[in-house]
Amino acid sequence: MTVAESPNLMVAGIGEMVLSSSTEARLVAYGLGSCIALAVWDPRAKVGGLAHFMLPSGPASGSNPVKFIDTGLDPFLRALESKGAMLSRCAIKAAGAAAMLTVGGGLAIGKRNAEALQAALAQRGLALQASSLGGNAGRTVQLEVSDGRFLIKSLSSVIEL
């Protein structure tokens, strides 16, 4: 996967989400370590979104809810629905959650992120159709809005989910 700068490239930085209904759009999150990129794509509406979550939980009234899975998932899903996506027909995929950082007593942020995401999706009646979570390597991901391809690039490989 070559991620070249173009007018159709939309980048989700840490704590950000990007959404598009343009079939020319490519949604990208660079340098995922313990963070998680969640890609959601509706094949009928041709709407895609990518959220770049940093931590499993955060303050209930923070200025950047998408930084945290517990406060950011609902705004992300609502934004997709406002663009015409129907969650029941969406492909939901994720990557990241590598073992890059530990906090305090050795609680792995990546593992906690993966667990929090899967639990939050389950609470909403949703599940991942595919994922590349864990390990100890960083990743860059790209969602092609035209066809829903979710590409994951690491130092050693490029895979498609």
Residue ranges with predicted function:
Residues 1-161:
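Active-site microenvironment for binding and transforming phosphate-containing groups
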